[in-house]
């Protein structure tokens, strides 16, 4: 088998979410270094902005690089991340074992259509002087270590609800990969050269952009893809009609269709 690892970044502003970069991870530099370099490329945020990520990228180095550009971080944390509740060093997973539904600091919140029990910790993490950390369990999975999820915000002024709602906005990057695999052959192309791979990803990103912006107004990728597909089909039939109308031979028409 032969595969490639990808680091992808999406930018979102005023309801418009587009692919910003698709970068080949070839182990010549770490994923952390790649994301740090992307942060350096970004212009300073003109308003309060957020870097949304999974637990791979919630490291002090990455978050520091983004905060310098005016981006707070809202991301997932690994459950073995060290916290300091009451000044006592503990893994988040170990601390969560002591939580009870009846604790005054444990509350039930709704995110989307689901309910979660949450506990909020504010304070120090290794390499981070102050952040808000949310320990959460699904309503029906409270106390189950495998169900524990941990989230972080370097903007401690956000409420627990705001942190969780903000984190859900990173879903478009998951959709981008799913759509690129199902519609743009991300998981089935057969290219080995680095240059060829990068060229393909560039074309793929361009097609994704065209699908989202083809009408001059932003729409979902699925809507744009369906519309462009229909437009291409109409153009093909129109060209075939003109060819037949010009008294083209059967062989010429067959060659055009085939």
What is the predicted function of each stretch?
Residues 7-11:
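Short beta-strand scaffold segments in enzyme catalytic cores
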């Amino acid at each position: 088998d032969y595969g490639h690892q990808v680091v992808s970044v999406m930018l979102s502003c005023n309801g418009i979410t587009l692919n910003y970069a698709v970068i080949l991870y070839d182990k010549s530099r770490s994923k952390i270094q790649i994301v740090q370099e992307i942060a350096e490329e970004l212009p300073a945020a003109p308003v309060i902005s957020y870097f949304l990520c999974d637990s791979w990228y919630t490291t002090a180095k990455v978050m520091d690089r983004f905060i310098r550009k005016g981006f707070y971080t809202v991301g997932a944390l690994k459950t073995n991340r060290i916290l300091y509740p009451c000044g006592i060093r503990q893994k988040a997973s170990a601390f969560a074992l002591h939580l009870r539904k009846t604790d005054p600091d444990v509350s039930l919140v709704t995110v989307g259509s689901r309910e979660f029990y949450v506990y909020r910790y504010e304070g120090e993490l290794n390499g981070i002087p102050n952040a808000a950390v949310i320990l959460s369990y699904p309503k029906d999975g409270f106390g189950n270590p495998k169900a524990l999820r941990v989230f972080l915000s370097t903007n401690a002024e956000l409420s627990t609800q705001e942190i969780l709602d903000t984190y859900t906005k990173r879903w478009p990057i998951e959709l981008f990969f799913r759509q690129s695999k199902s519609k743009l052959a991300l998981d089935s192309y057969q290219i080995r050269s680095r240059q060829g791979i990068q060229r393909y990803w560039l074309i793929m990103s361009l097609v994704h952009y065209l699908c989202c912006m083809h009408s001059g107004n932003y729409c979902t990728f699925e809507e744009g893809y369906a519309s462009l597909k229909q437009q291409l089909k109409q153009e093909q039939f129109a060209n075939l009609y003109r060819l037949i109308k010009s008294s083209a031979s059967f062989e010429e028409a067959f060659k055009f269709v085939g």
